[in-house]
Amino acid sequence: MNDQHLQDLIHHAYANSPAFRVRLDGAGISPDTIQTTADLNRIPVLTKDEAVALQAADPPFGGMLAAPLSAVSRIFFSPGPLYEPGPEEDDAAWEVAVKLLREAGFSAGEIILNSLSYHLVPAGYLFDGAFTRLGATVIPAGTGPADLQLKMAHDLGATGYVGTPSFLLSLLQKAEEQGITLSIRRAVTTAEPLPPAMRQVLAGQYGLEVINTYATAELGALAFNTGDGMAMRLLPEPLIQVVNPDSGQPVGPGETGEVVVTTGNRLYPLIRFGTGDLAMNIDPRPGESAQAERAVILVGRRGEAVKVRGMFLHPNQLRFAAAQVPGVQAMQAIITRPDGLRDHFALRVAAAEGADEAAIAEGLKAAVQGVCRVRVDEVGFGEVAQEEPPVVDKRKWD
């Protein structure tokens, strides 16, 4: 989103969206002062909980709609509850989605099995529209019976798939059991995590090219991953920031923050909308990278994280770090503040029998420092029960 587009969007939203106008006025911000992306950081982040509260107080859209209700063709639902107008035919989001599919290797003439839901939520509709605009033929299977989807995929010669990775794997396994040969060679997965082990099965055992997509009901597709590793490359649109959840200011490379998005949708402009997702910010050329050069590593939800020495720490980051060190069977982080001033960050580790504890301790210190950007003060060994929480915060704040 260039500066002129951003300026036009801010003025349009201020003039036509009562909720956005109240938000800016409440923060003492004039729309004329938002000239660049850097200026955008002055606007408070709108959390999903706040959006839900706005809609509850002023249904159906909480004053966030910037056009008459008659301009809305479709209304979708996401948990909260939160109502979202679907993208209109001229929405720029379609072009971005089509570019993603082309970059992933899809082309006109393909037949796509769409196993995402078409009911209430936008996922099925969004990918349906993107594939048809690409020139593909879509089988709108939705959440229909697996046996019927398998038959349709076989009979119609489906070459591509979009849906959850777990359902794709179950279809492939079912086809294998029944001696059915499928023509699916490429898949877009979304709506749930894609563990490395499952990707390996899909790619190695079944020979599929897998494009894992980060998308939300409110915002559509935001990032994607086409190979090994956890980094997901950002799409060029909408405008995506990774910010400190407390201050709302952008975090540096390698730091973890909340994914915050500004859409260019003039019908329903979501400006500085907080997804609640925490991610590590990957920026190869800080301050110079185009958005499409940047990436994120999703680590979890905001409510599950704790802050240690100014850095947000999520249990999934610790799990990832522990998985890099041989001999670690279980691990728990314990955060204390013994002197009332400085955080003490310790790890309690259950090691495999006969494992080199000294090597594990050094390996974990390096892995956690690299993944979480937090220095480990102490590593101890002992039992760690499976039911115990991965992070224990013993700090006293009174």
Where are these regions (language model features)?
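Nucleotide 5′-phosphate-binding alpha/beta core
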Residues: M1-E103, S107-A108, L341-R348, A355-D398
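Active-site glycine/GP-rich loop and adjacent strand/helix microenvironment
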Residues: D3-Y14, P18-V22, L134-D398
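Hydrophobic/aromatic beta-strand patches that form the interior of the parallel beta-sheet core
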Residues: Q35, T47, I112-L113, I139, ...
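Acidic/glycine-enriched edge-of-secondary-structure segments
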Residues: S78-A92, D128-T137, A158-V162
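Short secondary-structure capping/junction motifs at helix and strand boundaries
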Residues: P85-P87, F106-I111, T137-A141, I211
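Short glycine-enriched loops at secondary-structure junctions
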Residues: W94, S117-H119, S166-F167
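Short, well-ordered alpha-helices that flank and scaffold nucleotide-derived cofactor binding pockets
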Residues: K99-R102, G129, Q173-E176
